[in-house]
């Protein structure tokens, strides 16, 4: 489903517009799609993003855009004009400006634009919510399996520069910044074939990891004036309408791309040692103590060696850390600060899915139902799945029309309640009627969003003290070596003769 159907090209800044036929007699709501792909891959041309079924069924206008990804869209040398970073996000903003100026010509209503996206696309939607110049270009937002506060979604300016200079080194370009020239660095990168840059991107990551990407948005003080967490905490979201959600097994897809013992070609029944190693890959850049806390929380201590339980636990670690708990945190903060929020968990595994059963409902596999792919007669979906896809398209279109996914013509049917910070109500989306639940993986998310930050904060001073002690020790050690060398040199000299 994710395989590219076009050649790699730097000539990529296009958008697509679908309009219902016959054309509506009055302006119709507009849905604008941003694809995911970890900010390193993706294209609006993928078959799964075909908008014809959604548009014809719900008579909305649908727009999808391309934006630059990887180093082409997110390489950053903060402080330089040549590569300021976040140009992929600026591509998206430009598309939103185009929609405001032109969508009326396609029957769309520029005063009723809903921005929706999945994974990195959802994180992008969130960043536009947090960036004032973007905020006025759309009116509602849908974030599917991603959030701007995810640990993978942004980097700081220092790390962004390190990655840029590392890529330059890998392709034989001079370093920028201190001791170098950013203009020369960027000019050199422009002489390298696009495929050479793509082939070297993954080598700039600081350590082995899953669900981490080389070139992502940077907290630059411009597009993002502060970290997403700080902007979410400080924001005023009164009047905003947001739909957020996750799939049942967010982590499983990523494990087959680098976690020890995992493969899409077998049952991935891992050992305890592989689980422990997998935690370090799944939660990179944390201290040993924090990793131990993750292991403690996710181990089933009645069956600590059971391979299937360990496999499921590591899937939960990766999914909770990167998707579920950032989304839950975002939903709670937005709701507490005045937004009207609706939340879901997508729990249906498609009958056509080729991934092994142990992967459950993987990351990204709600999209085909949102876009109505089961209505394509050439596909082999079941009748129940076609009905399910029609339901989901109606929910998304209702939200685009009114800010409420519920069916206004059926007030006695199952109702989707708003998500609040207190009640934390969400719905399960599968072939059955809506089921309302409470607490989106509340225990796990209390660990990630409450306990672990406090643990890291409490141990930061210890870590800093240890770093200072080590620095002083190494300085003292080097002095001792120098003194010993000087003493040895002196002791070998001829002694002064008696005067």
What label would you give each PLM region?
Residues 2-182, 191, 222-257, 339:
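Serine-hydrolase-like catalytic core of hydrolytic proteins
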Residues 292, 296, 315-316, 324-499:
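Mobile gating loops/cap/lid regions near enzyme active sites that modulate substrate access
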Residues 84, 88-91, 322, 359, ...:
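Secondary-structure capping and boundary motifs in well-ordered enzyme cores
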Residues 148-149, 153, 188-386, 395, ...:
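Substrate-gating cap/lid region and adjacent catalytic-acid/histidine neighborhood
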Residues 38, 274-278, 456-459:
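Short, cationic low-complexity segments
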Residues 173-186, 200-202, 306-307, 343, ...:
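Surface-exposed patches in mature extracellular/periplasmic domains of secreted proteins
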């Amino acid at each position: 489903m994710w395989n590219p159907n076009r050649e790699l090209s730097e000539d990529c800044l296009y958008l697509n517009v679908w309009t219902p036929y016959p054309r509506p007699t009055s302006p119709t709501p507009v849905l604008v799609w941003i694809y995911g792909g970890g900010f390193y891959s993706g294209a609006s041309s993928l078959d799964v993003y075909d908008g014809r079924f959604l548009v014809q069924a719900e008579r909305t206008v649908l727009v999808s855009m391309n934006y630059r990804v990887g180093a082409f869209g997110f390489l950053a040398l903060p402080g330089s004009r040549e590569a300021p970073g976040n140009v992929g996000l600026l591509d998206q903003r430009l598309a939103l400006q185009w929609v405001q100026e032109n969508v009326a010509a396609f029957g769309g209503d520029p005063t009723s634009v809903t921005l929706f996206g999945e994974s990195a696309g959802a994180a992008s939607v969130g960043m536009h919510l947090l960036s004032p110049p973007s905020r006025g270009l759309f009116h509602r937002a849908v974030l599917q399996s991603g959030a701007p506060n995810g640990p993978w979604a942004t980097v700081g300016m220092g790390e962004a520069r390190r990655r840029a200079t590392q890529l330059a080194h890998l392709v034989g370009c001079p370093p920028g910044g201190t001791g170098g020239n950013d203009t020369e660095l960027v000019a050199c990168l422009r002489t390298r074939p696009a495929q050479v840059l793509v082939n070297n991107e993954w080598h700039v990551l600081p350590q082995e990891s899953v669900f981490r990407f080389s070139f992502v948005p940077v907290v630059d003080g411009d597009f993002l004036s502060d970290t997403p967490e700080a902007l979410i905490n400080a924001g005023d979201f009164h009047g905003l309408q947001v739909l957020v959600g996750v799939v049942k097994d967010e982590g499983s897809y990523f494990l087959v791309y680098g976690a020890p013992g995992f493969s899409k070609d077998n049952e991935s029944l891992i050992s305890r040692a592989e689980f422990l190693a997998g935690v370090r890959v799944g939660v990179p850049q944390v201290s040993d103590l924090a990793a131990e806390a993750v292991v403690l929380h996710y181990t089933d201590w009645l069956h600590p060696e059971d391979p299937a339980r360990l496999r499921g636990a590591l899937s939960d670690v990766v999914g909770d850390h990167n998707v579920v708990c950032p989304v839950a945190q975002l939903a709670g903060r937005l709701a507490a600060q005045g937004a009207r929020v609706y939340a879901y968990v997508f729990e249906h595994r498609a009958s056509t899915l080729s991934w092994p059963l142990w992967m459950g409902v993987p990351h990204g596999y709600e999209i085909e139902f949102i876009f109505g792919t089961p209505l394509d007669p050439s596909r082999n979906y079941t009748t129940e799945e076609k009905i399910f896809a029609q339901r989901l398209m109606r929910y998304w279109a209702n939200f685009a029309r009114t800010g409420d996914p519920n069916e206004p013509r059926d007030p006695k049917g199952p109702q989707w309640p708003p998500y609040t910070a207190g009640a934390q109500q969400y719905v399960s989306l599968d072939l059955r009627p809506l089921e309302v639940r409470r607490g989106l993986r509340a225990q796990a998310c209390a660990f990630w969003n409450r306990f672990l930050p406090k643990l890291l904060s409490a141990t930061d001073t210890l870590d800093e003290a240890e770093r200072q002690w080590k620095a002083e020790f190494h300085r003292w050690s080097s002095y001792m070596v120098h003194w010993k060398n000087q003493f040895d040199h002196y002791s070998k000299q001829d002694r002064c003769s008696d005067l």
